[in-house]
């Protein structure tokens, strides 16, 4: 409790000078940028002398606007009824949505999404259970694209309409692997392609799909091993 406190600083990349912005008491978080600020997760400042002994309770998501003190940061999400939950927020690539992962009470994460294009919009629950692995890859055109173990212990890739997020409305794009592999990652590669990586027989296998889940081709590797990709829309 306290050994992994995180402090966040902001640097001007042109001059390599640190700006006055300084975030304390952050934990289990990164910085996800939107506009002239960023979202991060932090706990309330502990009492003096109890920085390393206080229980970790009240993990909130905040928005920090550049050039302002941390005390002016606004709370983007809090859940006083569940003080032991962890909350991590990320912004979609087109900055249209704020994606919230909620953990601490199961083996996975619950997921909520907020439309950032409409002021005052409410959080939409995409998956309420923390008993499943859920990873929202991106939000595009009112649809969330998510890698999930819901209905597929070895994971599948689905599209979720934010206006109708119930499980029975999910559209499966890449199903659970019929050959026993685990779908470990899916990434967008340009506007109309996906790269999916399966862990099968102690080796990674990568495939290119279109956005409807049609297999385009396998990416051939020279030998067995582990593969990772860096791509975006």
Stretches found by the model and what they are:
Residues 1-233:
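Peripheral, non-catalytic segments that deliver or gate enzyme domains
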């Amino acid at each position: 409790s306290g050994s992994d406190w995180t402090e966040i600083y902001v640097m001007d990349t042109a001059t390599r000078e640190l700006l006055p912005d300084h975030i304390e008491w952050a934990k289990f978080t990164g910085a996800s940028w939107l506009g002239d600020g960023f979202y991060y997760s932090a706990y309330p400042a502990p009492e003096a002398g109890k920085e390393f002994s206080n229980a970790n309770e009240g993990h909130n998501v905040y928005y920090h606007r550049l050039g302002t003190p941390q005390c002016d940061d606004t709370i983007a999400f809090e859940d006083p009824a569940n003080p032991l939950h962890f909350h991590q927020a990320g912004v979609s690539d087109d900055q249209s949505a704020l994606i919230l992962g909620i953990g601490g009470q199961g083996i996975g994460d619950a997921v909520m999404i907020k439309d950032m294009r409409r002021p005052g919009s409410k959080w939409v629950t995409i998956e309420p259970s923390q008993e499943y692995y859920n990873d929202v890859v991106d939000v595009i055109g009112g649809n969330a694209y998510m890698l999930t173990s819901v209905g597929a212990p070895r994971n599948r890739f689905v599209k979720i309409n934010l206006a109708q997020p119930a499980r029975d409305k999910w559209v499966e794009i890449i199903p659970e692997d019929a050959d026993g592999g685990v779908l470990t990652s899916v990434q967008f590669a340009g506007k109309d392609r996906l790269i999916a990586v399966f862990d099968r027989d102690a080796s990674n296998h990568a495939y290119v799909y279109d956005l409807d889940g049609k297999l385009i081709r396998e990416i051939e590797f020279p030998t067995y091993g582990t593969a990772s990709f860096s791509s975006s829309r």
